[in-house]
Amino acid sequence: MPIPCPHFKITIVKRSQGQSAVAGAAYQSGERLFSEYDQKTKFYNKKKELVHAEIMLPSHAPPGYADRATLWNAVEAVENQWNSQLARRIVLAFPVEIPKEQYLSMIKEFCQEQFVSKGMIADFAIHDKGGGNPHAHILLTLRAMDEHGRWLPKVRKVYDLDENGERIRLTGTCRPALL
């Protein structure tokens, strides 16, 4: 019997390394997006494994941020330093033992509980070529939004601690599907 091979990687999108939140969003969603920062269109037309892409907003976020280009261009505009950290990128693998029909509800629940409920915006995409590597990409704003839809200052490690300061465990979301 094969053993599940978990993969969960968190990185920061950094302008100082030539990275772009708009490019990351274009890559994971398969959409053609124009970057106002460098005046270039970002498009990765070789991405054939896209299953689903969605943006999850907190209730008080401006509705215009449901548009991927608007959201990530706004993020890049507010992060205006040459060495700005633009977004948090998470890539996580789905265990192949979990039925594909559960991927969407699992990732939405995870994003809602861990990020959107804390005021962050989550842009996620599920990829699956059908070759045993189903995974999700999540692009997160580093700043949460206040109740008026304005960006708050960045908060360190908001993604890995719950309201009691305890470490968040992914098993809470995935465990029922694995049993």
For each feature predicted by the language model, list its residue ranges:
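N-terminal nicking endonuclease/strand-transfer module with a His-rich metal-binding environment
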Residues: 1-179
